[in-house]
Structure formats: C-alpha cells, structure tokens
C-alpha cells in the first residue's frame, strides 16, 4: 500500500522515465514503515521535516525558486495539508511550489469511499486503543482493511487455491 515504486514499475510503465525523458528532475520520497521507535513522530513532523524539507532540498538542488509537487494516496493528503500550511507560511511571491497534483488522494474525509463500511464507533475505538498501546498504526492492520475491500481477489482466491 502507498509504495513509491508505483511510479516506476518497469521501463515501459514508468512515470519517472517519462518525466525525466521530458527533461524534468524527479525526486521521490517514501514512507518508512513505522515502528515503536517512531511513535513520537506527529503529522506536523511529516509536514515540516518531510514535505517542506523535500521541497527545500529540491529547489536548492535544481537551483529553481519553485517545484511541482505530486502526492499519491495518503501522501496526497499530506501534500494537501502542506499546501494549506505553505500558503499561510510563505509570502505569495515566495511560495516554493508552483503547481501540485494529487493521485488517488482522499481530500474530503467526510466521505471516505468504500472503506466506510469498516468505519464505526467500535472500530475507531479499537484502532485508537491499538495505536495508543503501540504508538503507531501497524501496516498489516491497514493492509487487512484494503484486502477486505477486494476480498474476492485478495482473500478468497488464496483460500480457494490453497485449501479447497
């Protein structure tokens, strides 16, 4: 889930190759799978030490005043939040992002889409309790929810092929 290499699958299926062939410099960051050691990291840390730092490094490296920023999935939610922050933090003529694009990004969190079937008070409570104990959301827990959304191909197919 949410892996950077979706933009660089093969030489013939690579947005990275396409963009570099067009003369763009491409920088990709990816989430580190969290563990207990990262339980103190908060969302604003991802904004300031993640996105804002990446934008700063990219503008310096390329010697340009602005970059184009792309967010994928939850990274797009982070980019959306970053852009709201940046528009308040930077003067309009000093904004380091010229354009931004989102792929498969949920921006209206009041309508979460198909995953809504798993969201109720009890499931949120259980998730919050688990995260309070561990200090982070284990990727396997998130992956389980996504597998259930595609149960025919990601769950039952395994059972049919291996046990029936």
Features from the language model and the residues they span:
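Alpha/beta-hydrolase active-site loop
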Residues: 40-61
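Short, surface-exposed "cap/lid" segments of acyl-processing enzymes
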Residues: 1-36
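Short, glycine-/Ser/Thr-/acidic-enriched flexible segments
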Residues: 1-2, 31-34, 53, 74-75, ...
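Alpha-helix capping and helix-loop boundary segments enriched in small/acidic/polar residues
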Residues: 6-10, 38-46, 69-70
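Beta-sheet entry/capping signal
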Residues: 1, 18, 23-27, 57, ...
């Amino acid at each position: 889930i949410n892996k950077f290499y979706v933009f660089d699958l093969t030489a013939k299926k690579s947005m990275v190759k396409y963009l570099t062939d067009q003369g763009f410099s491409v920088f990709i960051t990816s989430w580190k799978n969290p563990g207990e050691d990262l339980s103190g990291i908060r969302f604003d840390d991802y904004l300031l030490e993640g996105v804002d730092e990446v934008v700063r490094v990219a503008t310096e490296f390329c010697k340009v005043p602005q970059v184009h920023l792309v967010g994928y999935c939850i990274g797009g939610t982070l980019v959306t939040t970053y852009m709201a922050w940046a528009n308040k933090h930077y003067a309009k003529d000093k904004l380091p992002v010229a354009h931004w694009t989102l792929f498969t990004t949920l921006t209206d969190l009041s309508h979460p889409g198909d995953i809504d079937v798993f969201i109720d008070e009890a499931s949120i409570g259980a998730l919050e309790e688990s995260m309070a104990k561990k200090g982070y959301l284990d990727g396997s827990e998130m992956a389980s929810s996504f597998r259930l959304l595609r149960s025919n191909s990601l769950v039952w197919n395994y059972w049919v092929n291996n046990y029936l």
